[in-house]
Amino acid sequence: KIDNFKNYDISGSIESVIDNCDLVIDASPGGNGFVNKKNIYEPNGIKAIFQGGETIFNDKSVADILFNSRVNYAEAFDKNYVMQGSCNVTGMGRILNPLREKYSDKLSRFDATLIRRWADLEQTDKQTVDTIEMTEQPHHGTDVKAYFGKDAPLFVRAIKVPTKQMHLHIM
């Protein structure tokens, strides 16, 4: 990819760019956001928003809150570090929260089945395997419970199918 920039004069460092920022939107590959937070953002007092490839759990946590505009918009205002959930986690929150608001006294549980593509379009190095794979308790349920509460009656299954075209939620 460096060849794509051969006609440009590039100078400075990531730190010199960060010096002029109030907020960084970190879209680096999963796991790198935590390293960036510890090595760059925290030491320089820079706020950051992280992508869904990171985590808010355990010792690799990048943020205090998993953000979903339909669920916890106002709570994110004072946070220095926020994580935007994956597309599946965000979609579930946007669909389920209005149902919770309108029918909370009538709902006993939420069941969701995610039918997921095997690999994202840009993952050209990741082979689309001709098989179907089911995950009984994928991270999506735990992530959604981060903003609904750990005792939310949410039960999620994920099924990977051999395609790169879509995700589908059955709720």
Report the location of each language-model feature.
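Active-site-lining helix/loop region of Rossmann-like oxidoreductase modules
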Residues: L96-I170
